[in-house]
Structure formats: structure tokens, C-alpha cells
């Protein structure tokens, strides 16, 4: 039924688990959906701290022991108050200059997720343990990411650096590259943008069409975005990088999402903005995948991770080839 101004009112209907995904993905989708989150009031920092601590604890328990002795971890303090976890997979050559600057999502922990990234990428990872709201709203997290990139540039050439993140980490990855470029820093070799929160105004179509379908994001995240922005305009490119001017420069990028991802539109729109600016950009969409795919439990998740590894290896290898053949 069509409403004024083109709004469509849909009748209540059942959405089955599709037969077009793996059995493992079907099993994940058959689980009860995440309960709707009731965010605290913006002026109640103690309640926000308690909610964040509970989320962090759940993720730490889920990730415990996944990396084991396959990596070594060294913590580094950054100017301004942030920290970097340098994670090196076992057996990596000491002379290997490749570094993946990993920016975790809003609900993740520094070393737990990044250890898996280091193993999958077979490269050294610098994971930014950035300051977060409610105690440190915007631009603290972005400041810490910039400080990490500056520290990394002091040790590695930019063409050996790839920056990546998922969800809020995808937001910060894109925002960091825009800010670094605006401040005259060299661009990294490439960017990995996995289901990025590219538009904090939630204007994209999927924020309506996938409402109730995404198993990980049960509803709007606007309250947490407002907490992070601390009164700043949500449409600013450093908050909503979709609004950045990509014609001024941006590295090649890979973007990933799924058809049930609440941030499907954020990802698709960001990919289109990059392509309009002439930036090489790949877009990979998983059938029926929600925010974060199938939580790492299905073959579809591994396919996406292999695509990311291929993309990173391609861009790191291109640098090696140019160094070996300077006439090219």
C-alpha cells in the first residue's frame, strides 16, 4: 500500500530462512534474533559504562583462547592517551615491513579480535585501542587513530600499510584516511571497509528495509551515535565519511556487507561514492548476511575473509613489484 510521498506500508509477513545459504548459515539464522537494545540517556554516563562493560565481557569470553600461542602481543602507549597493540603472528620474518592497521568496532576489544586478523592476514597488526565514549567522545577515537597512523608512518613506508576495520571500525578507517589526507599525510596502500557505519544520520534505505532482519543490530544505533558525536553535526565527513570529498584522494578499497545487514546502504553508498570519484573499489555482498555476516560460523564468512586477504596481498604485492621494477 502506497502512502503520501511514496512511503510504502507493508502488511505483516513472515520472512523464512533462505535455502540459498549454507547449512551453517541457516543454523545461525534460525537462532532467536537479538533483543532490542534500550540505550541509556545521553546524560547518564554511568549507565553507558555499565552497558559497555557488559558487552566487552561477553565478547572477551567468546574470543578467549582463539589465537593462543600463535601470536605475540606488545602494547605501546600513544601520545594523547590511546594505545596500540602490536600483534605479530608466529614465524613472521623480522624484515617483513607489511602492517595492517586494525581499527576495531565499537563493541570489540583491542587484542582479542586483532589476533585473529594477524593470523588470517599473515602480517603484523597494529590494533588501535582508542578512547571511547562516554568519557571520551568525538574526536578522541579519531585522534588516537591518527596518532597511531603517524607513529606507524615513522617506522614504515605508507605503501606497506593497509588500514581496515568493521562497523564502527570501518567508520573510523574511512574517517582516518580522510583526515590524514586533509592534514597532508601520505595515503596507505589500501583500505578494508567491512560493513562500515558510513552515515551516522542513518538516511540509507536498509535502515528501514532491514529493520528486524539483521540478527546483530536489532534497531537504530542513533542514540550511540549521538553519544559519540557529543553535539557535533552527524553529517560531518569525519563522523559520516560517506560525505567526504573522495576526488581529493583515497586509496583502493574493498567493502563487504550482506543483504540483511542494517548497514547495507551505508556500504553500497560508500562504494558508489568511491567509484564516482574514480577510486578503485570492490564491493562484496553476502546472501542473507547480517551485520558481521554469520558471526564467523559459516563458510560464507570464510569466503569474505579470503577475499579480504586476496585484496590485501594484491596491493602489498603491487608495491613489491614496483620496487623490483622501478621502470614500470
Q: Where does each model-flagged region fall?
A:
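Catalytic histidine-centered segment of alpha/beta-hydrolase-like enzymes
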Residues: 289-300
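Short strand-loop-helix active-site module centered on a catalytic nucleophile
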Residues: 84, 101, 117, 138-200, ...
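Hydrolase active-site cap/lid region
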Residues: 178-235
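A glycine/proline-hinged amphipathic helix-loop "lid/cap" segment
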Residues: 1-92, 320-328
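Short amphipathic alpha-helix adjacent to the substrate-entry channel of hydrolases
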Residues: 111-128
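Short beta-strand element of the alpha/beta-hydrolase
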Residues: 96-106
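Catalytic active-site module of serine/aspartate enzymes centered on a nucleophile-bearing elbow/loop
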Residues: 298-328
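Short beta-strand/loop motif that positions the catalytic acidic residue
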Residues: 249, 255-257
Amino acid at each position: 500500500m502506497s502512502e503520501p510521498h511514496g512511503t510504502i506500508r507493508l502488511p505483516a509477513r513472515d520472512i523464512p530462512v533462505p535455502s540459498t545459504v549454507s547449512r551453517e548459515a541457516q543454523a545461525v539464522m534460525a537462532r532467536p534474533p537479538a533483543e532490542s537494545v534500550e540505550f541509556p540517556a545521553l546524560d547518564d554516563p554511568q549507565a553507558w559504562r555499565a552497558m559497555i562493560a557488559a558487552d566487552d565481557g561477553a565478547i572477551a569470553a567468546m574470543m578467549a583462547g582463539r589465537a593462543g600461542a600463535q601470536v605475540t602481543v606488545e602494547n605501546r602507549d600513544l601520545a594523547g592517551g590511546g594505545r596500540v597493540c602490536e600483534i605479530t603472528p608466529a614465524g613472521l620474518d623480522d624484515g617483513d615491513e607489511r602492517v595492517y592497521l586494525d581499527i576495531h568496532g565499537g563493541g570489540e576489544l583491542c587484542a582479542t579480535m586483532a589476533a585473529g586478523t594477524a593470523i588470517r592476514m599473515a602480517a603484523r597488526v597494529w590494533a588501535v585501542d582508542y578512547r571511547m565514549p562516554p568519557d571520551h567522545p568525538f574526536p578522541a577515537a579519531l585522534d588516537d587513530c591518527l596518532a597511531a597512523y603517524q607513529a606507524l608512518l615513522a617506522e614504515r613506508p605508507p605503501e606497506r600499510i593497509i588500514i581496515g576495520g568493521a562497523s564502527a571500525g570501518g567508520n573510523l578507517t574511512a574517517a582516518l584516511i580522510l583526515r590524514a589526507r586533509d592534514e597532508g599525510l601520505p595515503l596507505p596502500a589500501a583500505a578494508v571497509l567491512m560493513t562500515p557505519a558510513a552515515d551516522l544520520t542513518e538516511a540509507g534505505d536498509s535502515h528501514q528495509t532491514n529493520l528486524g532482519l539483521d540478527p546483530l543490530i536489532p534497531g537504530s544505533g542513533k542514540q550511540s551515535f549521538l553519544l559519540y558525536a557529543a553535539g557535533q553535526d552527524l553529517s560531518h565527513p569525519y563522523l559520516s565519511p560517506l560525505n567526504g570529498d573522495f576526488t581529493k584522494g583515497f586509496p583502493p578499497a574493498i567493502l563487504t556487507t550482506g543483504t540483511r545487514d542494517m548497514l547495507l546502504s551505508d556500504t553500497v553508498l560508500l562504494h558508489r561514492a568511491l567509484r564516482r570519484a574514480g577510486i578503485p573499489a570492490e564491493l562484496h555482498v553476502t546472501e542473507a548476511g547480517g551485520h558481521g555476516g554469520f558471526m564467523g560460523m559459516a563458510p560464507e564468512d570464510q569466503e569474505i575473509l579470503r577475499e579480504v586477504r586476496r585484496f590485501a596481498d594484491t596491493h602489498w604485492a603491487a608495491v613489491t613489484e614496483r620496487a623490483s621494477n622501478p621502470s614500470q
